[in-house]
Regions:
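Conserved SAM-binding loop
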Residues: 58-59
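Short amphipathic alpha-helix with an adjacent loop that forms part of the alpha/beta core around
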Residues: 74-85
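Conserved SAM/SAH-binding beta-strand->alpha-helix loop
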Residues: 51-52
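Conserved SAM-binding strand-loop segment of SAM-dependent methyltransferases
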Residues: 63-73
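Conserved class I S-adenosyl-L-methionine
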Residues: 22-31
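C-terminal substrate-binding/active-site "lid" region of AdoMet-derived donor-dependent transferases
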Residues: 96-171
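S-adenosyl-L-methionine
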Residues: 1-21
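Glycine-rich SAM-binding Motif I of class I
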Residues: 33-37
Length: 171
């Protein structure tokens, strides 16, 4: 399932509704951990953020594997891939309402790589696009947390147009 919201309370409510105590959760854009703190401590949590203020706050959460890097970079994806090759939940909150193009690219690549059961995205631009678009006559629907019709085509190196990604991603 893929859920989209902008309101942070709705985003966290969607997470609480779907998360299970034993889930592997990859959180992209954890900032200082306000959403991370709402997750059960029994989850396997990998949280990533490149903001300077994130490190100090995330160090307080000993049960979280925090990575202070940019989620747009291949090296960051590779680092997480070495920790886990799949996840139950992919959480994406990169700036809340800005850069829907970047958020979608990050979603596409990370979800194609880790094949989450659920993806929850917080982004105003994507939500506005979704709420404004029509396309009901074509039946492309994913029941998982990734775009099922694309299967593995979002995994580097298969995305040739993204120069940030390399072909060194191997199991």
């Amino acid at each position: 399932m893929i859920k989209l919201s902008y309101d942070v309370k709705k985003y966290r409510s969607d997470i609480a509704e779907l998360v299970k105590d034993d889930n592997t959760v990859i959180e992209l854009g954890c900032h200082v951990g306000r959403t991370t703190r709402t997750l059960p401590e029994t989850c396997n949590i990998i949280a990533i953020d490149n903001s300077p203020e994130a490190s100090k706050e995330m160090e307080k959460l000993s049960y979280v594997n925090f990575i202070n890097e940019d989620v747009r970079l291949h090296d960051t994806l590779l680092k997480v891939f070495k920790i886990t090759q799949s996840c139950d939940m992919l959480l994406i909150d990169l700036g809340g309402g800005y850069h829907p193009d970047t958020v979608f690219k990050v979603f596409y690549i990370w979800s194609s790589t880790f094949k989450p059961t659920h993806t929850i995205i917080r982004n105003r631009g994507l939500l506005e696009f979704f709420n404004s678009a029509e396309g009901k006559c074509e039946k492309y629907v994913s029941h998982e947390g990734f775009l099922e019709s694309y299967h593995d085509s979002g995994i580097p190196p298969q995305i040739k147009e993204f120069s940030l990604w390399t072909d060194s991603l191997e199991k």
